[in-house]
């Protein structure tokens, strides 16, 4: 059984603290619960723990920019109100065999959400995430501590293109981001939001999940 936590809009710093707290509780109590956190962030840039600062075009000391170096893998990415973000906290029984399977499952989740609107997407060899015609729509980055995962994926719906263009997302030279509403201009954000909520509700009912909303 999976516990689903829905925060709505939450700043990145707070969500990061919440994730780490949940992970360390799981480890300390030797729990193997599955937690899935759904939310949106205000404007923020995050760098993976080994990310290259050359991939950002603004000064990293600029106090007007919300920038954080975090403990996930991957390079730089951008979050804002126009994304659906899913953070999963899951215990991997056999880490060596399950990491690639886990990443593939996260990518499959992103693809299934896009398929709700009959949007075909693909994976790109050596680059985690989901792409539509060489443009990235789903970003992915995870961290594993003692076989317990956290961080997850983000799906672009109506992100600020201007802010996204200030970075070399995931360190890919030709990696251009794309928004869902660029592909489906007839679908409003409200329509997308409610269809997404209905699908989650069906999944919740079928899986008998516990749901906590904030």
UniProtKB/Swiss-Prot annotation:
Pathway info: Protein modification; protein lipoylation via endogenous pathway; protein N(6)-(lipoyl)lysine from octanoyl-[acyl-carrier-protein]: step 1/2
Site-annotated residues for Lowers pKa of active site Cys: 136
Localization terms from the record: Plastid, Chloroplast
Catalytic activity annotation: octanoyl-[ACP] + L-lysyl-[protein] = N(6)-octanoyl-L-lysyl-[protein] + holo-[ACP] + H(+)
GO cellular component terms attached to this protein's record: chloroplast
Active site: 170
GO molecular function terms attached to this record: lipoyl(octanoyl) transferase activity
One GO-annotated biological process of the protein: protein modification process
Residue intervals of the BPL/LPL catalytic domain: 30-214
Keywords per UniProt: Acyltransferase, Chloroplast, Plastid, Transferase
Superkingdom of origin: Eukaryota
InterPro entries: aa-tRNA-synth_II/BPL/LPL (IPR045864), BPL_LPL_catalytic (IPR004143), Octanoyltransferase (IPR000544), Octanoyltransferase_CS (IPR020605)
Known EC number: 2.3.1.181
Enzyme class: transferase
Record-listed substrate binding positions: 72-79, 139-141, 152-154
Additional record remark: In the reaction, the free carboxyl group of octanoic acid is attached via an amide linkage to the epsilon-amino group of a specific lysine residue of lipoyl domains of lipoate-dependent enzymes.
Function, as annotated: Catalyzes the transfer of endogenously produced octanoic acid from octanoyl-acyl-carrier-protein onto the lipoyl domains of lipoate-dependent enzymes. Lipoyl-ACP can also act as a substrate although octanoyl-ACP is likely to be the physiological substrate.
Family affiliation: Belongs to the LipB family.
Name of the protein in its database record: Probable octanoyltransferase
Organismal lineage: Eukaryota, Rhodophyta, Bangiophyceae, Cyanidiales, Cyanidiaceae
């Amino acid at each position: 059984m999976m516990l689903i936590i829905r925060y709505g809009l939450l700043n990145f710093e707070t969500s990061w603290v919440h994730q780490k707290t949940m992970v360390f509780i799981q480890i300390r109590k030797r729990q193997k619960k599955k937690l899935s956190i759904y939310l949106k962030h205000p404007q923020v840039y995050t760098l993976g723990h080994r990310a290259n600062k050359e991939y950002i075009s603004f000064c990293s000391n600029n106090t007007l920019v919300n920038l954080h170096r975090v403990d996930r893998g991957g390079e730089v990415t951008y979050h804002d109100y126009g994304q659906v973000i899913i953070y999963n906290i899951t215990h991997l029984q056999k880490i060596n065999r399950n990491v690639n399977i886990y990443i593939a499952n996260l990518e499959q989740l992103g693809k299934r959400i896009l398929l709700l609107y009959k949007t075909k997407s693909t994976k790109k060899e050596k680059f985690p995430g989901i792409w539509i015609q060489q443009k990235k729509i789903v970003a992915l980055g995870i961290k594993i501590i003692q076989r317990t995962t956290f961080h997850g994926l983000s799906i672009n719906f109506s992100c600020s293109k201007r802010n996204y263009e200030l970075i070399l997302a995931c360190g890919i030279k030709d990696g251009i981001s794309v928004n869902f509403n660029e592909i489906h201009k007839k679908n409003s954000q409200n329509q997308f939001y409610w269809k997404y909520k209905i699908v989650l509700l069906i999944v919740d009912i079928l899986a008998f999940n516990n749901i906590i909303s904030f």
